[in-house]
């Protein structure tokens, strides 16, 4: 009896793969960005392979648009490579944050095996595929071979049941899962999510949860495909295969979560597993940030805009909203969400990873405090080492921007 992940590795390797086995598996796609791509390209060139262009996806996103000469050099290097070898390529204004683009453009689909040279490649498990973060050198090898060795991961089954309370979303659920198991608590395992609560969550919320399995050290994430999954991919691809766990599949452990008990939550410095109900936190803030591969989708921006409509942010707070892709940006324009946000005093930017990694466009100065929808709040993550980052869902971030301190949306409405 096998888990879905064991079945996928079996099919992709041609072996009877079980957790703990080492296999060489064929990948459907390998993805790099402007930061990880240059090293992958160097490795590929050194090996002298012929590229498997139809399986290579190049998506500049971390320092986009380039913030300085060095980042411009990196951008040019990955673009030149993509154009030379006719790979999939999403340039400025046509793509966005790599993980969002991989989902939007149909690269992620049930049953696929994908490697990405970025730690949050786990995100695509929301669509019932196996997606893993790898190193740049490994990506360069895959450019020419289409294969990679894997240790088949054990599966932690996270059973989440109960109807979430109003204002509780995927971000709050995954923060509470992290609080339960700790950072690194699922190291090199697959975190599979099941239970009645998943039925209430749209693909956006599942993506948020899958994204932050990285913070638990997980090798990958997995959600079973359902009608919401198929609706999401319907106009993107028809090439997929649905895998499910056998009834008597073996799990490394089973963790039960009652979603009905979860409150809107915030992760306080300096760890994503350091979680409190938002009602217990009230620190003053300097910046509020809505965006990233974790919570920069149109659903997130809509929810923030509902809180901000006809209101003004605190005079001492800067609010930044950064959509996860050009598609999200365009949709926000069409729906009038950009006007709502800027009328409230917020700044609506083009798509980039930027501030999430302390790169640019929202970097924090000494002693500053930010509440953010991103995925990490380690020391110095978004700027100066003395700055502080709190993690929360978009509604909480929007409400906090208005109040000038960490606040619940209930205080606004």
Curated annotation (Swiss-Prot):
The keyword Iron-sulfur applies. It catalyses: (2R,3S)-3-isopropylmalate = (2S)-2-isopropylmalate. Its cofactor is [4Fe-4S] cluster. Gene3D superfamilies: Aconitase, domain 3 (3.30.499.10). Pathway: Amino-acid biosynthesis; L-leucine biosynthesis; L-leucine from 3-methyl-2-oxobutanoate: step 2/4. Binds 1 [4Fe-4S] cluster per subunit. Its EC number is 4.2.1.33. GO terms for biological process: L-leucine biosynthetic process. It is an enzyme of class 4 (lyase). PANTHER family: HOMOACONITASE, MITOCHONDRIAL, HOMOACONITASE, MITOCHONDRIAL-RELATED. Belongs to the aconitase/IPM isomerase family. LeuC type 2 subfamily. HAMAP family: LeuC_type2 (MF_01027). This is 3-isopropylmalate dehydratase large subunit. It comes from Picrophilus torridus (strain ATCC 700027 / DSM 9790 / JCM 10055 / NBRC 100828 / KAW 2/3). The gene is leuC.
